[in-house]
Amino acid sequence: MFNFRSFDTLVDPNNLDETHLFDIIGKVVEIHGVQEREFQGKNVRLIEIVLEDLSGQQLSCTLWGDYVDEILVFEANIKAGPPVIILQLCRGKLFNDKVVLSTSFDTTQIHYLDTIPAIVEFKSQ
């Protein structure tokens, strides 16, 4: 169901293909405040989160548009401990000489249910 990329394969800017969509799983360790920016002549909302893999490596991820509301609802309902999410069909982008993750228009899906086998497995490790 998912085609996960490891954080190790994403952090090297020389290996970045900004056109390739992939899936990533990680623990949400930071959720920053909502921002508004002008993008292609329109005001858009965004929020940055930081994901961490099992080895402690972290990647920043920018969620755009409707994904902002989705992550805020998710954040409000966190019961205990750092949550684990799956970003399905996201992409890597080069920003300030670092690779960051980004949602891809209406294509990306955010999965966060504790019953998803990949999330259960991630949490058990």
Language-model features, listed with the residues they occupy:
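Single-stranded nucleic acid-binding proteins centered on OB/S1-type folds
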Residues: 1-125
